[in-house]
UniProtKB/Swiss-Prot annotation:
It comes from Klebsiella oxytoca. It is a multi-pass membrane protein. Pfam families: HATPase_c, HisKA, sCache_3_2. The chain crosses the membrane at residues 15-35, 198-218. Residues 247-455 form the Histidine kinase domain. This is Sensor histidine kinase ZraS. Its EC number is 2.7.13.3.
Length: 462
C-alpha cells in the first residue's frame, strides 16, 4: 500500500512539473509572437507609407518629364506639386536644389525659401534610393526623400524629345525631392498596438505567475498531505500501542502493588542491618522503578490533552529552574538564565512545558555529574515561533547516541528508563513544535525546541 501510494505521489509530482513547464513554455512562445507581430505591424505600416511616397515621387518625375517635353518646366512642376499635395495623408511636397533652396513647393508661398541648410542635406546622405526619417516639428511626420531625376526614364519618343532640350536643362544642378506624410494616424495605431501588446504581455505574465503559484501551492498541499498521512499513521500506532500498554499496565500494576506491600511488610519485620531487610528494600525500589516505567510508557502512548492558556515563558523557565536548583547546587552546578522582558506570550500548556524543561534539566545534571553550567535561553524567531534552548557542559554524546536520543527505551544512563526524551519530543510535537539536539564527545549537549506563538494541538490540526 505504501509503495502504491508513493508511486502515485511521484507520478502526480512529475505530471505537475511537466504541466507547469509546458504552460510556461507556451506563455513564453505566446509572448515572443506578440512582440514579433507588434514589430511586424509597425514595419508594415511604415513600409506602406514609404511605398506610397515612392509611387508619388515617380509619378511626379513622370509628369515633370511630360512638362519638359512640352517646354513647361518649373511652372508645370509647381502645379503638379500643388495638385499632388491633396493626396490623403500628404502634408507637403518640396523640391530643392543641392543647397536646400526650395525650387517648387506644395505651398507656393515658400518657393525661394530655404527648406534645410546645406549641412543638413549633406548629413541626410541623399542618393538615388528613397530614404526616410521621423520629424517632430512643426508636427509629427514621416519624411521621404531622394534625388529628383525627371530626366531619367521615359520611352523612346520621350528620350528623342529630351535630346532636343537646351544644354542648360540637361546639365542642371542636382535636385532633391521631399514628401512629408502625416503620422498622427500611424502613431495612434502604434499606441494602440503598444497598449494591446502590453495588455497581452501582462495577461501572459498573470498566467505565468498563476502557474508558478499553483505549482507552489500544489507542492505545499503535497507536503501537508504527506505530513497528515504520517501523523495519522503515527496516531493509529500510538492508539494501538496505548490499548496494549493500558492492558499491560493493568496486569502489571496489580501484582506490583502486592509485591511492594509485601516488601515493605518484610522490611518492617526484619532487622535493619540484616540481609533480608536490604533485600526487601531493593524489592520495593525495583517495584517503584517498574511502576514509574509503566507510568512513563502510558504517558508516551496516550494522546496529550493540552490545556492551552496565555503563557509567559520567562515565568515558566524561572519556576522550572527553581525546582532543580537545590539538586544542582548540591552538585556545584550553576544555572544560568537571562529573562527577556520583551518576549511575547504564547498559547501553550504551562504544566507540560515545565515537564519538558525538567526532563532536559535532569538529563543535563546527570550528564555533568559535578561542577558545570546549565544555560537556558529563549528568544523570538520572527516567523511566528519562539526558540528555547538548554545547553550543558557535560560529557556530551557520540554521533550514534545522538542519532538515537529520542528513540523510546534508549538511554545513556545505567538506571534510566529511556522514555524521558521520547516524552519530551511527544509534548513538543503536540504543541505543533519541533525539537533537535546537538552534541559531541567532551563538548556538552544543546537541546533546542521551537514552539508556535499561536499554539494549536497537533491532533486538532489534523
Amino acid at each position: 500500500m505504501n509503495v502504491m501510494r508513493l508511486s502515485k505521489d511521484s507520478v502526480a509530482v512529475g505530471l505537475s512539473w511537466l504541466l507547469t513547464g509546458l504552460i510556461l513554455l507556451l506563455v513564453c512562445l505566446f509572448s515572443a509572437l506578440i512582440v514579433r507581430d507588434y514589430g511586424r505591424e509597425n514595419e508594415a505600416a511604415r513600409q506602406t507609407i514609404q511605398e506610397k511616397g515612392s509611387v508619388l515621387i515617380r509619378a511626379l518625375e513622370s509628369g515633370t518629364r511630360v512638362g519638359m517635353g512640352m517646354r513647361m518646366h518649373h511652372s508645370q512642376l509647381q502645379t503638379l506639386l500643388e495638385e499632388m499635395a491633396w493626396q490623403p495623408g500628404v502634408l507637403w511636397f518640396a523640391v530643392t536644389d543641392e543647397n536646400g533652396k526650395i525650387i517648387a513647393h506644395s505651398d507656393p508661398r515658400r518657393v525661394g525659401e530655404s527648406l534645410y541648410p546645406a549641412s543638413t542635406l549633406r548629413e541626410l546622405n541623399i542618393g538615388s534610393e528613397e530614404r526616410w526619417r521621423r520629424l517632430e516639428q512643426p508636427e509629427p511626420a514621416l519624411e521621404i526623400y531622394r534625388q529628383f531625376r525627371p530626366l531619367n526614364g521615359g520611352g523612346h519618343h520621350m528620350r528623342m524629345m529630351m535630346r532636343r532640350e537646351s544644354a542648360d536643362l540637361r546639365n542642371q544642378a542636382p535636385q532633391v525631392i521631399f514628401i512629408a506624410f502625416d503620422t498622427r494616424e500611424l502613431d495612434a495605431d502604434h499606441a494602440r498596438g503598444l497598449r494591446n501588446m502590453v495588455i497581452m504581455l501582462c495577461a501572459a505574465g498573470v498566467v505565468m505567475a498563476a502557474t508558478v503559484l499553483a505549482q507552489f501551492w500544489f507542492r505545499r498541499y503535497q507536503r501537508s498531505r504527506k505530513q497528515l498521512q504520517e501523523a495519522t499513521a503515527r496516531k493509529e500506532k500510538l492508539v494501538a500501542l496505548g490499548h496494549l500498554a493500558a492492558g499491560v499496565a493493568h496486569e502489571i500494576r496489580n501484582p506490583l502493588s502486592s509485591i511492594k506491600g509485601l516488601a515493605k511488610y518484610f522490611a518492617e519485620r526484619t532487622p535493619a542491618d540484616g540481609e533480608a531487610h536490604q533485600l526487601a528494600l531493593v524489592m520495593a525500589r525495583e517495584a517503584d522503578r517498574l511502576n514509574r516505567v509503566v507510568s512513563e510508557l502510558l504517558e508516551l502512548v496516550r494522546p496529550a490533552h493540552l490545556k492551552y492558556q496565555s503563557v509567559d515563558l520567562n515565568e515558566v523557565i524561572t519556576h522550572s529552574l527553581q525546582l532543580v536548583s537545590q539538586d544542582a547546587a548540591s552538585r556545584a552546578i550553576s544555572l544560568t538564565f537571562t529573562a527577556q522582558p520583551a518576549l511575547c506570550r504564547i498559547q501553550a500548556d504551562p504544566d507540560r512545558l515545565k515537564q519538558v524543561l525538567l526532563n532536559l534539566y535532569l538529563n543535563a545534571v546527570h550528564a555533568i555529574g559535578r561542577e558545570g553550567v546549565i544555560t537556558v535561553a529563549v528568544r523570538e524567531c520572527g516567523d511566528g515561533r519562539v526558540k528555547v534552548s538548554v545547553a550543558d557542559s557535560g560529557k556530551g554524546m557520540t554521533a550514534e547516541q545522538l542519532q538515537a536520543i529520542f528513540t523510546p527505551y534508549f538511554s545513556t544512563k545505567a538506571d534510566g528508563t529511556g522514555l524521558g526524551l521520547a516524552v519530551v519530543q511527544n509534548i513538543v510535537e503536540q504543541h505543533g513544535g519541533t525539537i533537535d539536539a546537538e552534541s559531541a564527545p567532551g563538548k556538552g549537549a544543546l537541546f533546542t525546541f521551537y514552539l508556535p506563538v499561536n499554539g494549536q494541538q497537533k491532533d486538532e490540526q489534523g
